[in-house]
Every structure is written in structure tokens, then in C-alpha cells.
Amino acid sequence: IAQKILINGKKEPLFPGVFGIFGHGNVACLGQALEENQKELPTYRGHHEQNMALTGIGYARAKRRQQIFVATSSVGPGATNMITAAGVAMSNRLPILFLPGDTYANRMPDPVLQQVEHFNNPGITANDAFKPVTRYFDRITRPEQIIQSFPSAIQTMLDPADCGPACIALCQDIQGQTFDYPEEFFKERVHAIRRPRPDEFQIKEAAEKIKSSKNPIIISGGGVFYSDAMDELSNFAIKHNIPVTQTVMGYSTMKRDHSHYAGQIGGLGGRNTNNLAKQTDLAIAVGTKLADFTTGSWANFENENFKLVSINVSRFDANKHLAQAVIGDAKVSLNELSLALGNWKAGEEWNKKSQTELKSWNEEVDKASAPSNQEIPSYVQVIGAVYKNSDPSDIAVTAAGGLVGEVVQVWRPRELNTHETEWGFSCMSYEISGALGIKMANPDKEVISFIGDGSYLMNNTDIYSSVITNNKLIIVVCDNGGFAVINRLQLFKGGKEYNNLLKSSKTPGLVDVDFAKHAESMGAKSEHVNSISELEEAFKRAKKSDVTYVISIKTHAYQWLEGSAFWDSPTLEIPTTEENKEAIKLYKEGKSKQRQGV
């Protein structure tokens, strides 16, 4: 409660709230403390520990890591249910504070309910599973330990370079104990996220490399959001005439009508941006960890003279693939690098080529996403219908499956900050839980979640959460009969359809799920539609609704936009089918272009 943060010059709570599911491991002591302080620190009831934590993570991303939710559970399954969410936060460099209950520090009642026992090490508990997926972990076995532990956790979560989840496991017997804490520990403290400046030498070296390039591109990542560097990115691109591509996490850091906007790059990118990547002799990566879907598993950059400049607040990310590192805040670094470049700019023909290819690709996407006479619509047709009837400020949310790549091609940003995804861990069911957190952070905006039937069936309880907390979502359920995108990969690798689509699984009692009725049972308004025209009308009704609105529609399981980048996904070394042989051939072609460093 005493922890505050400056956001745009205004003092705000660092911790806006707690998501909690109480059990014997946290209800009697921590639960009572939360009840007694609910006006200053509200607690929101969860319905699944993973989901409530994902909601907190979605909130933190939408708030650009400036506010942090707490997630608390009991010991045992409640705690381990949050492990997946911790992985989401860890891989996406997002803050959340986990406070799981733990076993007794004094061990007198061992084994307690839900305790896992390690015969060779009684100090290990289920909460040790948090260690690989948190930036900071501690177990409180004495009450005075929190004097050092909590400030350390906070500084980790607020550190722009080391940001990630923190876990402080609270032993049950210690939660209720007293200690004569110093008054200073409870005094208000105001935080501000630091903006480290880059080293002058690194700026100089980066500027020299850029000046020697002829066809540079920018790769804009999620760090541009967290640094609030969208204006600086725009100014840099215009001044130095450099096309801007975007990662999935950096999508909507630039608007579609910007003179240097190029679109999505890499495995989910368009042919236009991947053509730029093949030809570029230098990429300026800004705030991106350069994941495989961004780089085409490092096979996208085919120019033998290719060089990489990486602007990143994290030393670890900035130095990847022998890049010329610029270790610093994106906003500050772009300004200083621009000063070092002076009046230098790339040739006019390069960005003209980028815009020409973008126009051609957009026309192809528009044609694919337009309504047609086919009986079952494709993903892009569904997304196109929603996009056509949406407002520029509406926020699209995706996470797993084929919808992520289709949305970034169709949902071309008309305003900044209008696309949110979870593509670090690609966690199924984040589409609903994360969308709820994004809505809580943006109560005045429409939040539209695109989700497949596979993700929906995996976890959907936050439809109910959104209803009872008055956080309206629009959820578009695309039912293509199973895990269609992995079925696509299975076929691409030369395999036979097996255990992905429902029809190719062991399902003798197969029935269709009525997603609309299921959502309705949780208090949402809902309807099933059978065509794109019906979808458009349903979406208009959803926009007018004051409660969560779920629209389900059958979608094509085999129809996708064409991919144009390599992805290093394993292939059988010894083929067993003719299809395997073709897959191996394509795999070897891609591997032959993969860079060993830069």
C-alpha cells in the first residue's frame, strides 16, 4: 500500500490490486490482512490460479510495466497452477508478484495438507518449481526476512533490464507471526522506472555501421512500448529514411498510414517485409529479444554483408548474435543515435521499394480477407469482418495458434497501442484472461479477443470473471474443430493428420460444442453465426452491449495466408513417407540460409 509510482508525473499505486484464491495456506493470515485493507488494496476473486495470474500479466503489459498485480494462492495445486503464468511473465519480461502459501517453517505438523515430500531434502516444496520461471525467488521462514525480500522483489520487477515475475513463498506459520518492524519500512515510497543512457562509444560505433549501410531496416519490438518511444521511433525513421518492420510484441508501435511503416516481419510476417529482410545489409533492432519468429530462425537475413545494431536496455538481449550493442533505454538511445547520425539518411529508392511491396501485399491480404461464397470462412475473413466494423481505438488480443499470424496481417493499426498478444510463451487461454487484464487497464476502450476452439476449451472461466466485475469483452471464437495450426505444421513436416483436429483423434463420442450456450451459462451475451454477413451484424450488436459478448463461428481448418519465412522446427532425419522427403528438402534449404552468428 505504501509503494507508489510516478506515471506521467502523477503518483499512482504501484500495486493496484490482488488476485486471490484462498485456501488453508493463505486465508487465515494473509487473507485477513487483505480483508482489513481492501479499500486501499482491493482483492479480486479468481476462478483458476493460472487465469487470474494471466489477467495480472495482461494488465501489466497494457500498463507498460508501470503497475504490478499480486497473485496469491494456497500451497500445493493452487501454487503450481500459477507456474505456467510465471512462465508467461518470465518469457515476456513482465512483472507480477506471486505470494503462494508454503509449508510450515517449523516443520512440526509435517506433512501438511498438499505438501510434497522430498525424502532427501525436506527444504524443497512445490514452490521451488517457481525458480526457473521467476526473476526473483525467496521463501520467508522468519518474519523479519521481508524487510530485505520485498524491496528486492520490487526493484527486480521495476528494473527495465531485468524485469520479470517475482515469487515470495510465505510459510503458513510465519504469516501469523509478529515482529517489531522499523517504521521506515511502512513509509510511503515513490518509484520511477529508470532510463539508462547508452555509452558514447556504443553510439559512435552504431552510427558508423549505419552510415556504411545502403538498405537498412528497423525492427521495432515490445521494448518500444515499455520505453514509450513511439514518437522517437517515428521521428528516427522519417529523418533517416528507414523502413520500420515490427515484431509480434511490437505490433502497433507504428500506425499503418505512417510513411515508413512496413508491417510484421519474420515467421508471421508478410512477403513484403521478409523480402526487405532478405535484401537488407543492416537491421536496427529496437527493444526486441530477436526471437525465432522475428528472425526466421536467423535464416531471413540473406545479404552476405548483413550487420546488426541492437538497441536494448538489457545487456543480454543487446549482445545477441554478435550485434553492435547499444545498451540503454530505447527513447533515449534513439535520440542520441539520431544526433550521432546527423543528416545521414538512406537512399530514397529503398523506402519507396518498401512502400510499393507493402501496397502489393496489403492488396493480397485484402483480397483474402474479403467475404466470398465459400461455405466455411477462413480466419482472415473473420478477422477482416471484425476489423471492418471496429473503431480505430479498439484493441485486438491474441495469444496462441494460427490467429496470431493472421491478425497481424489484417489488423493493420490505425492507432498506436491497439494490438496485444502473448507470443513469448504462446500460452493457450491467455486470449481471455489476458484480455480481461487489458480491459481493466483500458476501461474506456473496446477489447476484442480472437480465440480458437482449442484455447477456449482449455480454460474459459474468465468469461465469468469479466461478467461479474463489469469488464466487458468481445470474444470471437473461431471453431475449426481442434488444434488446426499444429495440424498444419504436422502436415507440412510430412506427417499424417493425427490427434490435432478432433476428427483425427480418438473421439468415438464426438459432439459439437455449443460455445454460445456455454458462454451464456456464465452470464455473457452470446450468439452463433453461420456466415460473414451474420458475423458483421453480430459484431455490431456486441459493440452496443454493456456486458461481455461472445460470438462463435465455424472456420476453415486448412486455409491460411501464405508464409514467407523459415522456421527451424524439427524434421525427421530419415523419412518414412514421400511427404517426409519433401519436408526434409525444404528444411535443409532453410537451414542452409541460417546464420551462424551475424
How should each PLM-predicted stretch be described?
Residues 2-344, 385, 389-392, 472-475, ...:
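N-terminal alpha/beta PP-like core and its mobile active-site loop of ThDP/TPP-dependent enzymes
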Residues 12, 227, 234, 274, ...:
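Conserved structured core elements
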Residues 21-30, 358-432, 438, 444:
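Active-site diphosphate/adenylate-binding microenvironment
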Residues 51, 381, 464:
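Active-site phosphate/pyrophosphate-handling residues
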Residues 107-120, 267, 318-319, 326-327, ...:
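Thiamine diphosphate
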Residues 141-144, 167, 182, 309-400, ...:
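Phosphate/pyrophosphate-binding active-site segments
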Residues 172-175, 403, 557:
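Short, internal active-site loops enriched in acidic
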